[in-house]
Amino acid sequence: MQKEPMTIYGYEKLQRELKELKEVERPQIVKEIDIARGHGDLKENAEYHAAKERQLFIEARINELSEILSRTQVVDPATITHEKISFGSTFKVMDLDTEFVYEYTIVGAPESNPDRGFISFYSPLARQLIGKVPGDEINAKLPNGEIDYEVLEVYYKEISFE
C-alpha cells in the first residue's frame, strides 16, 4: 500500500474527528436507537429509522477515516525548506493574462479545499508547479484550459483548517 502525504495539521484534524466519532457520536447514537426502539413498532418508527441511518453514516465515516489515516505519511511542512515549491509550500502565482495573483498551499488529497487555497499534491496545477522557484513561468495545462503563470513567491505559512 502506497503512503499518501498529509500535513501534520490535516492528520491531527482527522484524528480529532475520528476520536469524536468513536467516543461521542457512536455511543450517543446507540442510546438514541435504544430509546427509539422502546417506542414500539419499528416499521413505522421514524425516530428509529433516522437513528439507524445516522449510525450507518457514523460507521462509514469511521471506516473512511481509519483507512485514510492508516495509509498516511505525515509531513510537517515547518521542517522542509521552501526555496522551491514542494509539499506543504505556500506560494503566489500570477496569471500572466489577467495579472491576478493567487495564493495556494500544497496539501494532501483529503485536506484539499481549492476555494480556501489548499490544493492537492496530486492536482494538475500542483504537479506542474512542484520544483518551481520565484521567477519561473509555466504554461499550466488544466482541465478547463491552459493558463500562463509566473511564480512570485514560495514560503512556509502555518496551515489552519479551522
Swiss-Prot record:
Coiled-coil segments on the chain, per record: 45-65
SUPFAM superfamilies listed in its UniProt record: FKBP-like, GreA transcript cleavage protein, N-terminal domain
Keyword annotations of the record: Coiled coil, DNA-binding, Transcription, Transcription regulation
One Gene Ontology biological process: regulation of DNA-templated transcription elongation
GO terms for MF: DNA binding; RNA polymerase binding
Secretion signal span: none
Secreted listed as a keyword: no
Name of one Pfam family that matches: GreA_GreB
Family under the similarity heading: Belongs to the GreA/GreB family.
Biological role stated in the UniProt entry: Necessary for efficient RNA polymerase transcription elongation past template-encoded arresting sites. The arresting sites in DNA have the property of trapping a certain fraction of elongating RNA polymerases that pass through, resulting in locked ternary complexes. Cleavage of the nascent transcript by cleavage factors such as GreA or GreB allows the resumption of elongation from the new 3'terminus. GreA releases sequences of 2 to 3 nucleotides.
Name of protein: Transcription elongation factor GreA
Organism this protein belongs to: Wolinella succinogenes (strain ATCC 29543 / DSM 1740 / CCUG 13145 / JCM 31913 / LMG 7466 / NCTC 11488 / FDC 602W)
